[in-house]
A protein has these predicted regions:
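N-terminal alpha/beta PP-like core and its mobile active-site loop of ThDP/TPP-dependent enzymes
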Residues: 2-150
Length: 150
């Protein structure tokens, strides 16, 4: 029987300290690449809180499909990748159309999507969908960050 690996605490993850989350690491990575703003709502929570603290402006959308098109427009107008964030499940599904448009038009849009806990994946958890499968047809590259050290 496979037992899941223990989830590391921030103190055991390289590059994070006790006061930081994976959201902080993502914000630092985006800042290194010149990202100044993202389009999102309140989720993924730790990313949104970290973005504000890290100086990444958050532009709020009403629905995820609108957020995807906002990120697309931003990329077209600035020449920089547009970043959109979304909650998992049905909310994430609303990103399919704008991501398909961006892919076919060769517009750089990055979607950061919350997911259920690793321990709840494939167990019919609330709003658990196969995001990898859903986004593979409308994205150049899709990955899941399974542990903070990634």
């Amino acid at each position: 029987m496979n037992t899941p690996k223990p989830i590391p605490t921030p103190l055991t993850v390289t590059g994070l300290n006790v006061h930081e989350s994976v959201g902080h690491a993502i914000v630092r990575a985006l800042k290194r690449h010149g990202v100044e703003c993202t389009f999102g709502q309140s989720l993924p929570t730790m990313f949104q809180l970290s973005a504000e603290a890290g100086g990444v402006k958050q532009i709020v959308y009403r629905t995820e499909n609108a957020g995807g098109y906002m990120a697309d427009a931003y990329a077209r107008l600035t020449g920089k990748p547009g970043i959109v964030t979304a909650q998992n499940g049905p909310a994430a599904a609303l990103l399919v159309a704008p991501l398909a448009e961006a892919l076919k038009a060769s517009i750089p849009v990055i979607a950061l999507v919350q997911d259920v806990s690793r321990l709840q994946t494939d167990k019919n958890a609330f709003q658990d969908l196969d995001h990898i499968g859903m986004f593979s047809a409308v994205s150049k590259w899709v990955r899941r960050v399974n542990e903070p050290s990634r």
